[in-house]
């Protein structure tokens, strides 16, 4: 029969106690009936957060104190420590000490009975007088928290959550620097440890403070200003992981990265004379106080964490964790705005050619200057670089605003007239077998066009044109920023927008393609031996393509946008319309990749000059077109296909639909074959 105290009430699983009503012996020798466990007047014992190892094995009710009362009665107070619970699969790699639900669950009485330690009692080898007294007394306090290795041995981090950093230690921790994403770290004790100037917490354990390990334990939520109690997590490890993700994401979108070294602070670490990219992101070391902290070796992290921020609150600079003597003024400036715990801030990751001092730097007043005259930064992150390009071009681009589109469009576009002009052009240019193939392709999608447009009224058609113009307004930026020859056409094949590279490649001027200048092209892809045929059919071609007769005087009634069929040779036109019939009402995000031959813009005078200079072309022109490295400049790009009037290309195109799910425009990109 186990000895029990008066207040030691049995639990439901205590098999060593008798049932209610049985007599048990107490210390005085008298017998007393045990309390009924179902008696409502029976005092309730507060449930412990975690039972000790002995009580857990015996299935007894334990308490929060260490050693617990049961272990004291049984003489097991020296070996009383928290029991190990079975962990979930996703927590198998988590340290046991990180799974405590509360902030001080198993750190209650680690320092109980130990004398208070003054800051001057720390020695250089990482031990203190309290540890020596503890070893002499023979008392052993076990812990389930992990131990970290250093050059002198091991140390644990039991009291990491009890540690309270003073202001001076938080802002100037010496050579120690921690990365929040690393669960382990190593410490080199080649240099003497700096003595503390202020006491920490009265409950601080000597074992935890012996090597300053608790100051920079990544599992300590105090280093990140985490309130684990408000996160509603069942375990401390999950709450810490969730808080760390939120901490890393805070302010990431508000800090544009920069490659300019003088606009980065050094809150994580600064460049050292002897160590620039030597350490991996998951580890950090210790150097002498005159040297700087480690530096991340990951360039992606450098771009993410660095940069100039327009918000002074986030622009803590290098004074937050600087280690030199030159940061006095900057330190006083930043104590109000700096975060009260370790945070990922802007860094001074200078290039090898930079003139930035390797020692600690202070924040210059120019870093808080939002003047537009300051040095332009070079952005390496693709997403932010695109935003910077957009902002830099916004001041000098576009003389019109998007609102002008909705005010200027008053009538719908006549797609019916455009299709009639296209059919007339096809009949006059192509042979009957080729015309039949194109007509079959267009006839296959004609019912779909009728079904989608028959319910649209005048307002819908006007809105459709506004959508087209607004989308085209956005594609203008895409065309200007893309170095690939690009054109945008309506669903009828009429050119609506064109890039400069396409004009250089084909010789078609933008004004001619958009119908702002007369079209004098006579090249239909027949070659030099069919120049007479081209001359005989040029007038009919111009008439069939919308009333543009080559022998007529230029005028506003004789100019219209060029059809896509006028830019391709016969086989390419047939293949395009057969592919368009499959994609127009098919996959809304589909695209087509194929090869084609673009027709160069040639007037009658150009065709005559090519025939006369054929011998000179073979000897001289080839040298200007292609060199050892490919095309030489814009002139060489323009000379491609100048002899036969055709440029072999690979092209990719897609169909953009409007709100009525009707094909609205065709976007095409070309790459010439060199």
From Swiss-Prot:
Protein name: Transcription activator of gluconeogenesis PMAA_028970
Biological process terms in GO annotation: cellular response to starvation; gluconeogenesis
Record's subcellular location: Nucleus
Keyword Chaperone: no
Function: Transcription factor which regulates nonfermentable carbon utilization. Activator of gluconeogenetic genes.
SUPFAM superfamilies: Zn2/Cys6 DNA-binding domain (SSF57701)
DNA-binding region: 52-80
Pfam families (UniProt xref): PAS_13 (PF24990)
Alphabetized SMART domains for the sequence: GAL4 (SM00066)
Gene Ontology molecular function: DNA-binding transcription factor activity, RNA polymerase II-specific; RNA polymerase II transcription regulatory region sequence-specific DNA binding; zinc ion binding
Domain of life, per lineage: Eukaryota
CDD domains, alphabetized: GAL4 (cd00067)
């Amino acid at each position: 029969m186990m000895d029990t105290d008066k207040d030691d009430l049995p639990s439901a699983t205590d098999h060593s106690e008798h049932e209610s009503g049985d007599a048990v012996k107490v210390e005085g020798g008298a017998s007393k009936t045990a309390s009924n466990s179902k008696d409502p007047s029976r005092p309730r014992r507060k449930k412990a957060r975690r039972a000790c190892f002995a009580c857990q094995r015996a299935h007894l009710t334990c308490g929060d104190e260490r050693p617990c009362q049961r272990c004291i009665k049984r003489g097991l107070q020296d070996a009383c420590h928290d029991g190990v619970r079975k962990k979930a699969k996703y927590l198998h790699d988590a340290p046991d000490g990180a799974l405590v639900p509360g902030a001080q669950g198993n750190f209650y009485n680690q320092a109980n009975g130990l004398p208070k330690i003054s800051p001057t009692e720390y020695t250089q080898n990482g031990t203190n007088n309290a540890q020596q007294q503890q070893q002499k007394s023979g008392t052993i306090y076990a812990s389930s928290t992990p131990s970290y290795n250093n050059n002198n041995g091991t140390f644990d981090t039991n009291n990491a959550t009890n540690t309270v950093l003073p202001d001076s230690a938080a802002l100037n921790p010496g050579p120690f620097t921690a990365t929040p994403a690393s669960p382990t770290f190593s410490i080199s004790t080649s240099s003497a440890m700096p003595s503390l100037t202020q006491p920490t917490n009265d409950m601080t354990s000597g074992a935890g403070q012996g090597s300053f390990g608790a100051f920079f334990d990544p599992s300590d939520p105090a280093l990140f200003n985490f309130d684990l109690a408000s996160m509603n997590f069942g375990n401390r490890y999950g709450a810490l992981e969730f808080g760390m993700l939120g901490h890393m994401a805070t302010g990431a979108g508000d800090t544009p990265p920069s490659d300019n070294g003088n606009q980065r602070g050094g809150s994580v670490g600064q460049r050292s004379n002897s160590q620039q990219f030597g350490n991996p992101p998951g580890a950090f070391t210790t150097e002498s106080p005159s040297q700087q902290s480690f530096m991340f070796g990951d360039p992606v992290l450098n771009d993410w964490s660095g940069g100039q921020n327009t918000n002074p609150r986030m622009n803590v600079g290098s004074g937050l964790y600087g280690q030199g003597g030159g940061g006095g003024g900057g330190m006083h400036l930043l104590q109000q705005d700096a975060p009260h715990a370790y945070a990922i801030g802007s860094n001074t990751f200078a290039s090898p050619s930079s003139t930035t001092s390797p020692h600690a730097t202070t924040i210059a007043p120019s870093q808080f200057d939002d003047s537009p005259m300051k040095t332009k930064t070079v952005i390496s992150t693709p997403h932010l670089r695109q935003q910077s390009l957009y902002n830099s071009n916004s001041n000098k681009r576009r003389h019109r605003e998007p609102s002008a589109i909705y005010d200027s469009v008053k009538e719908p576009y006549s797609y019916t007239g455009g299709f009639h002009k296209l059919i007339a052009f096809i009949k006059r240019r192509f042979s009957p077998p080729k015309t039949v193939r194109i007509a079959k392709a267009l006839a296959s999608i004609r019912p779909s066009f009728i079904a989608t447009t028959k319910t649209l009224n005048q307002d819908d058609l006007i809105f459709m044109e506004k959508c087209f113009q607004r989308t085209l307004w956005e594609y203008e930026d895409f065309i200007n920023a893309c170095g690939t020859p690009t054109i945008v056409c309506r669903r009828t094949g009429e050119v609506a927008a064109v890039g400069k590279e396409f004009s250089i490649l084909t010789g078609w001027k933008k004004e001619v393609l958009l119908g702002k200048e007369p079209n004098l092209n006579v090249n239909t892809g027949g070659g030099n031996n069919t120049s007479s045929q081209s001359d005989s059919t040029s007038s009919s071609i111009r008439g069939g393509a919308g009333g543009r007769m080559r022998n007529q005087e230029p005028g506003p009634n004789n100019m219209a946008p060029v059809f896509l069929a006028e830019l391709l040779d016969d086989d390419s036109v047939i293949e395009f319309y057969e592919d368009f019939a499959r994609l127009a009402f098919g996959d809304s995000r589909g695209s087509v990749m194929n090869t084609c031959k673009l027709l160069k813009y040639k007037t009658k005078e150009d065709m005559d000059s090519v025939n006369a200079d054929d011998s000179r072309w073979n000897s001289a022109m080839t040298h200007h077109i292609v060199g050892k490295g490919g095309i030489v400049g814009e002139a060489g790009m323009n000379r491609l296909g100048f002899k036969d009037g055709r440029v072999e290309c690979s092209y990719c195109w897609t169909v953009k639909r409007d709100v009525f799910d009707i094909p609205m425009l065709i976007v095409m990109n070309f790459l010439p074959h060199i």
